[in-house]
Amino acid sequence: MRASVFSFVLVMALGGCFSPEPRFFTLERVVGTIVRTPPRVIEVRRPGLAGYLDRSSIVEKDSAYQLDVNSGTRWAEPLGDMIGRVLAQDLSQRLAGSTVFAESGGISANADLRVELDVQLFDRAGDGMVRLQGQLAIEDGSGHRRLSARPVALAAPAPGTDATSLAAAMSALLGQTADQVAQEIALMREAEEDLAR
């Protein structure tokens, strides 16, 4: 009897030592409306991230003052690099004919424009809404002259409560950000043409 109890306790203790393998998630490009502009070279700078987001585990808001860090779900790459990469992919699709690259990638070139995003909040709140808040700037590539700077405040419902749904909603918000950037770049070009007349 003692041996079987000991064996049971040993098996349970060893089972507690093994945790399941973490699951890895990524953000994906979201197709948007193509904006007609003359070809440009555009660099997407590595986004700044609020410290609570700059980690491998996926973070969600549990309440107004509490975060839930799930060690079983992780980002497949550093979140700042991934946001920059996906935003560059989104912009490349929307600005057909332009060359768009992420600062964190392997390409470097003299850019006509630089897009900068400072992410202050990017998570799912208790109400199921995923929010992206921060600052967005577009600057001239040669002289670092600021052409546009404004706040970003977007929200979208997550289609479910799992990490896949969170990643899908976050991807959609990056797509909306790319829509706004593409429109701003198109308006800048129109303003340049008006000044040249």
PLM segments and residue spans:
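Soluble periplasmic/extracytoplasmic beta-strand elements of cell-envelope proteins
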Residues: 41-46, 59, 114-118, 131-137, ...
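Surface-exposed short loop/turn segments
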Residues: 18-36, 94-143
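A structural "domain/chain start" motif
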Residues: 17-80, 188-197
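Short secondary-structure boundary motifs at beta->alpha junctions and helix caps
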Residues: 67-74, 142-180
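Extracytoplasmic/secreted envelope proteins and their assembly/folding machinery
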Residues: 80, 84-88, 92, 171-174, ...
